[in-house]
Amino acid sequence: MNVSYIAHISGRVQGVYFRASSQQQAIEYSLSGYARNLADGDVEVLLCGDEENIEKMLLWLAHGPEQAKVTEIQHEKVPWQEHHFFSIG
């Protein structure tokens, strides 16, 4: 079943290829959506697709790429959003 989740990731997550790595991982899991930097230093990630794959992606986001240091991740299910690819904003 296709669903959408939004996640906010805190820690050392900007300037460490977090968004680009998230895009690569999302593509591996056949997910669409986006990853974008927020003014407060966090990263926001929208994930759209199969719920099982989103759960796997959320586990990956809890650690992120090697250079990142995730201190907190918050996520919630949101109304379905149609995205055809995963973009970086």
From Swiss-Prot:
Its EC number is 3.6.1.7. The keyword Hydrolase applies. InterPro entries: Acylphosphatase, Acylphosphatase-like_dom, Acylphosphatase-like_dom_sf, Acylphosphatase_CS. PROSITE patterns: ACYLPHOSPHATASE_1, ACYLPHOSPHATASE_2, ACYLPHOSPHATASE_3. The keyword Lipid biosynthesis does not apply. It catalyses: an acyl phosphate + H2O = a carboxylate + phosphate + H(+). The active site is at 19, 37. GO terms for molecular function: acylphosphatase activity. Belongs to the acylphosphatase family. Keywords: Hydrolase. This is Acylphosphatase. It comes from the Bacteria. It is an enzyme of class 3 (hydrolase). Pfam families: Acylphosphatase. Residues 4-89 form the Acylphosphatase-like domain.
